[in-house]
């Protein structure tokens, strides 16, 4: 694996010079191998090690290099044709392969090659970009988008129209991460490498980036870039220091543990916020 990483790191330093026409065989094979490993879930761009999320930057670099070494090509679809550098994940799947991997894909869901989809996942008409990791038992609902290299945990529900930000455009240092057992409400956006920790519930229409203030109304504490575990979050506003205006924020209205979350439905958690 170290040899593979070294090839990627070296090639990335001269990425501006690389084109589909001049990419050498060693680089091309290394990049394709990494994409295949990401696609199978054997590697992932970020993983939790000793309780902390660690981003493997060289894997992200391999994803970026894949755009340098591959030319656009015609991609056949059910209703149309496409022209892109990245093949679709399911292009060569047959019924036996789908059954073996154990997830459902509802048309016209689109998943790029290099994204991993775990067992018991349901993809409604949605989009999952290259390098993303979607873990077991997760629902990606209609028109939800999982951005490049985003990490989605087990038993997560991404509601209709949710946007989970990617790292490639604009280029971000770390992927957006949604940990296990989270619920992200309809039309919410979580971007710029924000981490939503385990068991959190994000209400409909909440927008969280690195500069968004995440205000805990119980403690008065303000978080940036991280939603603490077990938070129930709604959109809100905080007043300016001079009191003349207010600016958008996300508000943690309560905290719940796994036991409470198991007994009380998501809708009930969001309705009883007073």
Swiss-Prot record:
Family: Belongs to the transferase hexapeptide repeat family.
HAMAP family: DapD
Chief location category: cytoplasm
Keyword Repeat: yes
GO biological process, one term: lysine biosynthetic process via diaminopimelate
Organism: Escherichia coli (strain SMS-3-5 / SECEC)
UniProt keyword terms in alphabetical order: Acyltransferase, Amino-acid biosynthesis, Cytoplasm, Diaminopimelate biosynthesis, Lysine biosynthesis, Repeat, Transferase
PROSITE patterns membership: HEXAPEP_TRANSFERASES
Catalytic activity line of the entry: (S)-2,3,4,5-tetrahydrodipicolinate + succinyl-CoA + H2O = (S)-2-succinylamino-6-oxoheptanedioate + CoA
GO molecular function, one term: nucleotidyltransferase activity
Gene: dapD
Protein name per Swiss-Prot or TrEMBL: 2,3,4,5-tetrahydropyridine-2,6-dicarboxylate N-succinyltransferase
Cellular localisation: Cytoplasm
Pathway where this protein functions: Amino-acid biosynthesis; L-lysine biosynthesis via DAP pathway; LL-2,6-diaminopimelate from (S)-tetrahydrodipicolinate (succinylase route): step 1/3
Pfam family, one: Hexapep_2
First-level EC class: transferase
Assigned EC number: 2.3.1.117
Gene Ontology cellular component annotations, sorted alphabetically: cytoplasm
InterPro entries in the record: DapD_Trfase_Hexpep_rpt_fam, Hexapep, Hexapep_transf_CS, THP_succinylTrfase_dom1, THP_succinylTrfase_N_sf, Trimer_LpxA-like_sf
Superkingdom: Bacteria
């Amino acid at each position: 694996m170290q040899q593979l990483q070294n090839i990627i790191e070296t090639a990335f330093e001269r990425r501006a010079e690389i084109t589909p026409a001049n990419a050498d065989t060693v680089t091309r094979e290394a990049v394709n191998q990494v994409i295949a490993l990401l696609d199978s879930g054997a590697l992932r761009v970020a993983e939790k090690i000793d309780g902390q999320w660690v981003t493997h930057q060289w894997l992200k670099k391999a994803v970026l290099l894949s755009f340098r070494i591959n030319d656009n090509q015609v991609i056949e679809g059910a209703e149309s044709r496409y022209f892109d550098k990245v093949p679709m994940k399911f292009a060569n799947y047959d019924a036996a392969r789908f059954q073996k991997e154990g997830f459902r894909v509802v048309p016209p869901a689109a998943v790029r090659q290099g994204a991993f989809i775990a067992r018991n996942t349901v993809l409604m008409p949605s989009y999952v970009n290259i390098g993303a990791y979607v873990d077991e038992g997760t629902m990606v609902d209609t028109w939800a988008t999982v951005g490049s290299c985003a990490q989605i945990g087990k038993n997560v529900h991404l509601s209709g129209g949710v946007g989970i930000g990617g790292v490639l455009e604009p280029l971000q240092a770390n992927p957006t991460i949604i940990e296990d057992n989270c619920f992200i409400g309809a039309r919410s956006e979580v971007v710029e490498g924000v981490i939503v920790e385990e068991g959190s519930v994000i209400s409909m229409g909440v927008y969280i980036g690195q500069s968004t203030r995440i205000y805990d109304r119980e403690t008065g504490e303000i978080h940036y870039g991280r939603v603490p575990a077990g938070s129930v979050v709604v959109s809100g506003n905080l007043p300016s220091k001079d009191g003349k205006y207010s600016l958008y924020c996300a508000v943690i209205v309560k905290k719940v543990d796994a036991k409470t979350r198991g007994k009380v439905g998501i809708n009930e958690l969001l309705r009883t916020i007073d």
